Amino acid sequence: TRVRSSAASDVYKRQIEEEQDRILKTRKQNRTQSIADMVIRNYGHLDEKINFYQNLRSREDYFSRHSLNVAILCAMVTHVMNIRREEQYHTVCAAILHDMGKVKKHDAVYYGAPYTREDMLRNCETQEEAYGIIEEAFATDGSGIRRICQQAVRKQLDLFPEDGEKSRYKMLAGANVLLVANRYDEITAMTLQGTAQSEVKALQELLEHPKVYDPETVRALIRSINILPPGASVELSTGEKALVLNENEESVLRPTVVSFRDNSILDLSLPGNEDIQIVDVMKTMDNRYIFNK
């Protein structure tokens, strides 16, 4: 499994911070392409799943760490989906810049995963303010990058169909990838208050809204990162605690587990066990993951 060192992550985080600030001030990009190329070179050609690594975040580096994580997820998912190289590049660039409009904002609503329509609207409005700058900052690729950003942020409002019209346009593949990657990281990242939700909770949300989060894209995310690898401790809907023995590639939330209570083995994919659900995973409080070397 590929290892991403903390030192390397900090370097890329600083580069993203500097690039976002430069574009906002000068309306010109300088290093976006090289950052995107680096991410694609390291994560856009992997043929194995990785344990997705979450860093602790501060108010000062929240958006740059988020942008880096989303860019990494986008590189992996576009590779799994065999998206053509140009759109993969546009998608990773969009991930690097999609939250640029929030950089100078300090309201709590911009940190973490928005769960109400009002929060979503504020996020959308703030992000879209910066998207015109993206097209201006790039000589030739700006239009494609901007469209991916705009489609992804607007599609989020379809989570609240009773309060507004659904988007009518055909989503670009890259926009679907950005939408899924962004939401996954929003949910699983450590908040400024020190709380986080698990990858299981994130995946449950993505799977519950197939009209918003493209199912093919969600499947590609599942093929890119470990959600419930062997050895993961889980809580079942029966109240029991269990250990994952074998993954289920077809239905990742229904693996084979062994109960801590009596060492019984349960294959959650069998019809007889369909009433038993995985409620959540059990992990350390700081939400950090260890990469296998």
Where do the model's predicted regions map?
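Single conserved hydrophobic/aromatic residue that forms the stacking wall/gate
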Residues: 1-8, 12
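Histidine- and acidic-residue-rich, metal-dependent catalytic cores
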Residues: 14-293
